[in-house]
Structures are given as C-alpha cells and as structure tokens.
From Swiss-Prot:
Cystine crosslinks: C337-C346, C361-C369, C393-C398, C400-C423
Subunit structure: Homotrimer of disulfide-linked F1-F2.
Protein location: Virion membrane; Host cell membrane
Alphabetical GO biological process terms: fusion of virus membrane with host plasma membrane; symbiont entry into host cell
Segments passing through the bilayer: 491-521
Organism of derivation: Measles virus (strain IP-3-Ca)
Function description: Class I viral fusion protein. Under the current model, the protein has at least 3 conformational states: pre-fusion native state, pre-hairpin intermediate state, and post-fusion hairpin state. During viral and plasma cell membrane fusion, the heptad repeat (HR) regions assume a trimer-of-hairpins structure, positioning the fusion peptide in close proximity to the C-terminal region of the ectodomain. The formation of this structure appears to drive apposition and subsequent fusion of viral and plasma cell membranes. Some hyperfusogenic isolates can induce membrane fusion in SLAM- and nectin-4-negative cells and are linked to fatal subacute sclerosing panencephalitis (SSPE) or measles inclusion body encephalitis (MIBE). The neuropathogenicity is closely associated with enhanced propagation mediated by cell-to-cell fusion in the brain, which is principally regulated by hyperfusogenic mutations of the viral F protein. Cell-to-cell transmission of the virus also occurs with hyperfusogenic isolates.
Name recorded for this polypeptide: Fusion glycoprotein F0
Keywords, comma-separated and alphabetical: Cleavage on pair of basic residues, Coiled coil, Disulfide bond, Fusion of virus membrane with host cell membrane, Fusion of virus membrane with host membrane, Glycoprotein, Host cell membrane, Host membrane, Membrane, Signal, Transmembrane, Transmembrane helix, Viral envelope protein, Viral penetration into host cytoplasm, Virion, Virus entry into host cell
HRC: annotated segments: 72-98
Amino acid sequence: MSIMGLKVNVSAIFMAVLLTLQTPTGQIHWGNLSKIGVVGIGSASYKVMTRSSHQSLVIKLMPNITLLNNCTRVEIAEYRRLLRTVLEPIRDALNAMTQNIRLVQSVASSRRHKRFAGVVLAGAALGVATAAQITAGIALHQSMLSSQAIDNLRASLETTNQAIEAIRQAGQEMILAVQGVQDYINNELIPSMNQLSCDLIGQKLGLKLLRYYTEILSLFGPSLRDPISAEISIQALSYALGGDINKVLEKLGYSGGDLLGILESRGIKARITHVDTESYFIVLSIAYPTLSEIKEVIVHRLEGVSYNIGSQEWYTTVPKYVATQGYLISNFDESSCTFMPEGTVCSQNALYPMSPLLQECLRGSTKSCARTLVSGSFGNRFILSQGNLIANCASILCKCYTTGTIIRQDPDKILTYIAADHCPVVEVNGVTIQVGSRRYPDAVDLHRIDLGPPISLERLDVGTNLGSAIAKLEDAKELLESSDQILRSMKGLSSTSIVYILIAVCLGGLIGIPALICCCRGRCNKKGE
C-alpha cells in the first residue's frame, strides 16, 4: 500500500512540474509552442541608436621627418606624388559641391538686421545630383571648417610630431589629428639613425610609406567614385589610424558602455569634409551615436523543428524574431540590427504590428499557427532546448548512444522529446549529444493537439492557390448575378398574384398530404394480408 502511494505521489509531483513548465512565460506560451516544434533559443534587450554626435578628425598623411630629411628626399617626393593621385579627385568633387551651396539670409522687419535662415543648393550650376548627394552636400557644408580654422590647423600639423594629438582651437571644438606612421619614425627610425646607413633608412621609410599609401588607397578608393555621400566606417578608418582604434575613440571622448555594440553594428561613420593637397591631410567628420534602451521590450529568437503527420513532414511557420512589450507581441525586422549577448542594437526602429491571428498562435493557441509542408532540404529536424533534445525521429535516425538502441517515433506522435531519464547520450543525424534532466513531456500525441491550417509558401503553389481562389470567386459572382435576376423578376409580380400563388400551394399541400397518407396505409394493409 505504501509503495503504491509513493508511486502516486511521484507521478503527481512529476505532472505538477510538467504543468508548471507548460505555463506561458510572459506573453509567449513556450509550452504549447514546443508541442508543434517551436522553441525560443534566446532573449535580449532592445536598443536603438539615437541622434549622432559629431567631431572632427584629421588624418595627417605626411609624417614629420625633420630629422630624416637628408636621407628620405627621394622617397618623400614619390610618396607625395602618389598622395596627389588620391587626394586631387576628392578635393575637386568637394569643391564642386561646396561652391554651389550658399547661405540664405533674411531681413527681420523689426530690427532691420540680417539673420541666418539656412543654405540653398545652386542646382542649375551643379547639373545632375542624386537626392543622397544633395543631402550629403548640405551636411558637408554644415560640418565644414572655416578657412581660418584650416589655416590654423595646417600650422599646428606642421609642427607636431606625435602620432595622435588633440588640437584645440579658440572658440571651437577639439580636433583630433592622427598620423599612421609617425610612431614608426619616432620609435624605430630616429633611434637607429646612428646604426643604419642613410640609404637603408630611406628604403625602410619608403616601404613603410608605400604600405601606408596602400591602406589609404583601400580606405578612400571608394570615395573617388562618390566623395560627397560616401561614408567610411570606423573599422576601415582604424587601418589609416595605425590600428589603435581604442586610443582614437578614447581621444574622441567616446566612453559609452555600449561601445562594443555600436562598433559591431557599424554605427560610427566618417565623411570627408576637406582635403588639403598642400600639407597633405584629410579632415573627416566623425558621427558616433548614443544608444537608448527601450524599456520593457524583449526580443526573442524562435526556431522551428519539423514534425510528421503520417508520411507527411510539416513545420510551423513563425517569424524568426518577435518582440514583446507588456501584453503586446510585435513583429521584429532584424535587417538593421546586430545581435550580441548584451542586447540587440538597431540603427532604426525595428518593431511593426503583428496580425491578431499570429499573436493568438504565439500565446498558445496552436490551431492559429499556420503550417506548411517541408519541400526539399529543411534546416531543423532536431534542436536542443533547456537541455532536452526535441527531434523528429520519423524523418531522421535517432539512436541511444548509451544502449545502442534505435529510438522510434510512433505514428501517432508528431515529435520526440529525449531527456536523461530516457537516454543520457543521444546520437541523432550523426551528432552525439548529452542531454539533461527532463523539461518537456515524453511525446505529444497527435489527437491531443489542435493543428493550424495548412498553407503554401512555394511561389508556384501560391500562384495556383490564388488562381483557384479567383476562379471560385468568379463562380460565386455568377451565382449572385443569377440570384439577383430572380429577385428582380419577383419584384415584377403584384402582391395579389403572390397571394394567389401561396393559396394554391397551401391547397395543394392540404389535398396532397392526406392522399399520400391513404396510399401508404393501403399498401401496408395489402402487405399485411
């Protein structure tokens, strides 16, 4: 008696645990979704990039070689020639745009003084320009340094011999100046001047400058096609900055905790605003955004496993990503987003409305979840979730590695859930997996679950189904038209005629029904005799 009671208690506890696991967590009912092969494989916070901050960065292409002038004149002359081939086309394109942008000023009637109203683009003089180029041209004008600032910057760059230096100008923001080969000159060539011959120093510097020029060409080469609207990522800039991207970002004043997310999402961009072919430097406007976390929004990633109904293989059609906020479930467009362990970073709002039927599906109504037949090669026939293996063992070979036996899936089961109590180590599709304690029921019976409507995602099938639906609509239209004709003909009858017809029908019924009854009785009597 005690043994039977113990078994009952253990069974009750086990079922209670399973019921707890099947309850929805938040808005999405993971328990019911797992019955049709849909599981969540990760959740993360949601962050959106907000308005960018701007700062100027100068790439000083010509290093300070005052102490090496006697040994490097030939190499420097060749290096300058190469730089001009890159810089002059960019300079000409920038000048062509900025010369056709002028200030618009208006005169206030009260104080009779001019005030700035904006900028206007001289389209007639410019000729052909795309919308992106026009927008970039206006932004270029607004971020340009004044001619006086350029002169001051040129003078400061000629005297500095630091690889990275912050230059502050009166009344203006700090400008960061970077030279990619200055550290090499300061730390390797100058200390070894007494040990190396002049020719060898020139050769070493020439090779270093040639390599640096190659990096500059790969960085700014695409800008030769469209210098106005071309954007450069900070990762690409790191090559021209000597590879020390962290030091540069620190000098720029960026200390946000989401730096990794912005870097991975390539949110930091640079645009050329000035090219100087006299002192060989490029001025860039660096835009680096801040991140705003949208509170209470969680992004979930979904994965599906195929399941079998008889000889047919199906899978549930759900989005790859969804987002929850309060009771609301939204679709999530991941095209502009980067996914990291710390959260999801998007360059723009990625949420958009979800249909009520799909929301019902995700909340646990499996009959609202559309399904489609597997065609060709399907990605997932097994998946590991919460330490348990969810597998479609009717389509792939499932084997218990511990005992060497085949794990079979009964025809009335749509999926198999394998845990350590069933088989500690499983071999599925050639992959050996060690599973954990049970988190899901052993299997899901087909007759215990309501499946959703079948749909087709193949283009040919969709077209065929659409054609069939149109044909049925045309048939229904013809039937409606014929019924309208009958109704119109009925309208032509007078009310008196309708009354006569009804009386005749009633009299016919009163006479016909008794006659029919008498005939039936007569036949029954004959059979009885």
